[in-house]
Amino acid sequence: MLLSFYFNGLLLVGCLLSWGRSDTEGQCHTFTDLNIHNAIIGTGLKVQLLLYTRENPNCAQDLNEDNSTGFQYLNVTRKTVFIIHGYRPTGSPPVWIDDIVKKFLDIQDFNVIVVDWNRGATTVLYHNAAANTRKVADILKRLIDNMLSQGATLDSVYMVGVSLGAHISGFVGKMYNGSIGRITGLDPAGPLFNGKPPEERLHYTDAQFVDVVHTDIDGLGYKESLGHIDFYPNGGTDQPGCPKTILAGSEYFKCDHQRSVYLYISSLKKNCDLVGFPCKSYRDYRIGNCTDCKEFLPLSCPVLGFYADKWKDHLVEKNPPGTKAFFDTAAKDPFCKFHYYLDFMTWSSQTKRGYITIKLKSLDGNVTESKLDKDHATFQQYKETSLLAKFDQDLDQISKISVTFTTGSIIGPKYKLRVLRMRLRPLTNRDRPILCRYDFVLLENIEMEFIPIPCEDTNL
């Protein structure tokens, strides 16, 4: 009798729980979760089109299902963002999917559609996944055609493609003769696509605006420029914070490649701007040859990520299109570096070559340092030497500056660098004052600290 009462109680609780659960909760779809076994035996292509909006931010609806109820959430008057992942050698869902969906919905009430083609991307044979890219593009075209028939416009379509997903975006764009609004390619896949003609890969003609981020050009990514603007963080290789040896396991292979996604997500947070400097090469950027962005006035230098389309009008008008932008990042989110130009006018009679370390100190005691040690600088009498300094912290009010000069040599005499004028020019925040210091001597390997003063107008 007591046992019967116990089971009846459990049944009652179960009924109450089921009554309290909404219909929508029972119909939520999730990203396909596979494993290495699936990768070994292979998976046939099956695509879910997982829709998220502010009405269903935590409960995806699959628009690729027959008689899907998800279309009740699809408002074609909104902008639609497609997020398309790439090759999945182990079958696990991308770890960044939930974060990027949330960040998009925080910004605006988009239709966010996660293109889950994990069944098709999960395989140990990369070329099989690459062969499925056009099939995925065909499926996306059917959905977009459906949306257009309900009143959507191609202008409102924005595709964010990662690795192979970048080329899928390009294939979709080609089907509409480049009329879709925008494509962002996040480290487009290189293997099987490098050297291919435009019709077989992502190209700037695939959308009204195409911006691309390259973070693994010496590995899994595509090296050459593909968009109206191509960003090369840290030169497109060896991202800070990523493992340098194979002993780190799978992270060694995927960290650089994935960094493009995390840089993009950082741009959605709007903590700071990842400013790119248009330049011919990474070396030219490093030695300070590319800090002039007058061609974009009244705008500043372009920024990577979601807000890159603010520079669209300037970039698409170039003939031929194609701008490369370089910059360095920090190792961790939000990844920003804060750039300054450091100008030296010296009056030493002999030419000196060496390296500079500069520290900035704020009124509240914070300190940030930049070591300009990748390329030696040449200091000639009465000739200005300009160096690009990059700092991890953004110090608003600089109270003190310290500078160290070294030749890098451990033998021989110690040198002096006689400085007629040193000037610190902010590049990331160009509205801040330019600071100077006049007539001082740097002794090799001896740190010199001083209080900067506003530059004289004649020296700006």
Swiss-Prot record:
The cysteines joined by S-S bonds are C242-C255, C279-C290, C293-C301, C436-C455
Question: Which domain of life, per UniProt?
Answer: Eukaryota
Q: Which residues form the signal peptide?
A: 1-26
Quote the subcellular location field of this record: Secreted; Cell membrane
Task: Spell out the reaction equation it catalyses.
Answer: 1-hexadecanoyl-2-(9Z-octadecenoyl)-sn-glycero-3-phosphate + H2O = 2-(9Z-octadecenoyl)-sn-glycero-3-phosphate + hexadecanoate + H(+)
Q: Which keywords has UniProt assigned to this entry?
A: Cell membrane, Disulfide bond, Glycoprotein, Hydrolase, Lipid degradation, Lipid metabolism, Membrane, Secreted, Signal
Q: Which residues catalyse the reaction?
A: S163 (nucleophile), D187 (charge relay system), H257 (charge relay system)
GO CC list: extracellular space; plasma membrane
Any idea of its EC number? 3.1.1.-
How the protein sits in the membrane?
Peripheral membrane protein
Write down the glycosylated positions: N67, N75, N177, N289, N366
Which GO terms label this protein's molecular function in UniProt?
Answer: carboxylic ester hydrolase activity; phospholipase activity
Could you mention a single GO BP entry for this protein?
A: lipid catabolic process
Cite the InterPro entries for this sequence. Answer: AB_hydrolase_fold, Lipase, Lipase_LIPH, Lipase_N, TAG_lipase
- Family per record: Belongs to the AB hydrolase superfamily. Lipase family.
The record describes the protein's role as: Hydrolyzes specifically phosphatidic acid (PA) to produce 2-acyl lysophosphatidic acid (LPA; a potent bioactive lipid mediator) and fatty acid. Does not hydrolyze other phospholipids, like phosphatidylserine (PS), phosphatidylcholine (PC) and phosphatidylethanolamine (PE) or triacylglycerol (TG).
Name of the protein this chain belongs to: Lipase member H-A
What's the source species for this entry? Xenopus laevis
